[in-house]
Amino acid sequence: MDIIREIESEMLRKDIPDFKPGDTVRVHFKVIEGGRERIQAFEGLVIKRRGKGLSETFTVRRISYGVGVERVFPLHSPRIEKIEVIRRGKVRRAKLYYIREKIGKAAKIKELFEAPQKEDNIQEETNA
């Protein structure tokens, strides 16, 4: 079993930002149409993350022309170019399936405001 974990750990991506359900993300992924390859962005609310290791996936939901669209992305897929965290959401659930029934303003997630880091002050105090 350790051999499998070793091989999987080599394939894991290191450039994935820290995000969780409730966050709004923009996923840039490669789409192959015919012989052409282009990058397409999909922005929406993360409603769940599941699994671990190489098989970890996350589901992003957005409303497009009045219709809810959900897309499941493998987290460590080579087709994902990058993941941007647009805003952090304040939720108390790991799976946000209840958002599917909500419409309009009721489907909004409160934004989580983080205090700015004070790394500069800490470094100045240690140098003095």
Curated annotation (Swiss-Prot):
An annotated GO cellular component of this protein is: cytosolic large ribosomal subunit
Q: Which UniProt keywords apply?
A: Ribonucleoprotein, Ribosomal protein
Which GO biological process annotations does it have? translation
What SUPFAM superfamilies does its record include?
A: Translation proteins SH3-like domain
Gene3D superfamilies attached to this UniProt entry: 2.30.30.790
Mention one GO molecular function: structural constituent of ribosome
Instruction: Look up the domain of life of the source.
Output: Bacteria
Pfam entry (one): Ribosomal_L19
> Which InterPro entries does the entry mention?
Ribosomal_bL19, Ribosomal_bL19_CS, Ribosomal_bL19_sf, Translation_prot_SH3-like_sf
Which family is annotated? Belongs to the bacterial ribosomal protein bL19 family.
What PANTHER family does the database record attribute to this sequence? LARGE RIBOSOMAL SUBUNIT PROTEIN BL19M, RIBOSOMAL PROTEIN L19
Q: What this chain does, per the record?
A: This protein is located at the 30S-50S ribosomal subunit interface and may play a role in the structure and function of the aminoacyl-tRNA binding site.
The name under which this protein is listed is: Large ribosomal subunit protein bL19
Q: Which organism is it from?
A: Caldicellulosiruptor saccharolyticus (strain ATCC 43494 / DSM 8903 / Tp8T 6331)
Tell me the organism's taxonomic lineage.
Bacteria, Bacillati, Bacillota, Bacillota incertae sedis, Caldicellulosiruptorales
